[in-house]
Amino acid sequence: MSKITSSTLLKFKQEGKKFTALTAYDASFASAFDSEGVDVLLVGDSMGMVLQGHDDTLPVSVEDIAYHTRCVRRGIKRSLLISDMPFMSYATPEQAMRNATALMQAGANMVKVEGGHWLLETVTMLTERGIPVCAHLGLTPQSVHVFGGFKVQGRDADNAQRILDEAKALEAAGAQLLVVECIPAALAQTISEALTIPVIGIGAGAGTDGQILVMHDVLGISSGYIPRFSKNYLKQTGEIREAIRAYIDEVEKGVFPGSDHTFS
């Protein structure tokens, strides 16, 4: 199989082919996901909750992400590897440049940042210096305390328009991918149709170009709160690789996410 690049994902979008993404944190799981055909792997700051046992993602450090990026890189041959920029690691463009460089040197193909208009200068600076950027809008977990919890975003007209405007601005600033999380399905589809770059959804309906889930949710091994938008594929298959194949199949056929995993 050919390596997945941002150009591959753009081609998928242009052809109307849905693609899949999962979080990964070590070489063994990454190798399994890669060999089964998951297109994008994310070393997510979700590790703060699913690996480290915290209540949110805020305690995760750049060093944590870099370590797990190196682990995942050793396990993959095909998938595009994105690494999260953790909380307060990109508060200024200069800080973002330093920390993004560390993650790229650890093996990432792209870095992901959460935020809207305030990030435009940073996105442009990174991309102009050879660091591809994936933006993230909607429910941005690093802002959980600003939102007052993990809540659906963009339900009212003003916030929906703001998210759409920010998506367009981030694309213009140079972002090559966009993740939208926990927003109404109709808004996510509008954003996907308005942008040239691929849009990946999580809790955002089936109208996006790709889907991403946390691996612990897909395999039913998350402790504590289980998000409504997640689905335990291991429960219905009984084997990890079969679970991953089922996830890929349902995304490509438009079966997942269904109404049970979507917000209005």
Curated annotation (Swiss-Prot):
3-methyl-2-oxobutanoate binds at D45, S46, D84, K112. One of its GO terms (biological process) is pantothenate biosynthetic process. It is found in: Cytoplasm. It comes from the Bacteria. The keyword Cytoplasm applies. It catalyses: 3-methyl-2-oxobutanoate + (6R)-5,10-methylene-5,6,7,8-tetrahydrofolate + H2O = 2-dehydropantoate + (6S)-5,6,7,8-tetrahydrofolate. Its EC number is 2.1.2.11. Its cofactor is Mg(2+). GO terms for cellular component: cytoplasm. Mg(2+) binds at D45, D84, E114. CDD domains: KPHMT-like (cd06557). The active site is at E181. The keyword Transferase applies. Pathway: Cofactor biosynthesis; (R)-pantothenate biosynthesis; (R)-pantoate from 3-methyl-2-oxobutanoate: step 1/2. Homodecamer; pentamer of dimers. Catalyzes the reversible reaction in which hydroxymethyl group from 5,10-methylenetetrahydrofolate is transferred onto alpha-ketoisovalerate to form ketopantoate. This is 3-methyl-2-oxobutanoate hydroxymethyltransferase. It comes from Shewanella woodyi (strain ATCC 51908 / MS32). The gene is panB.
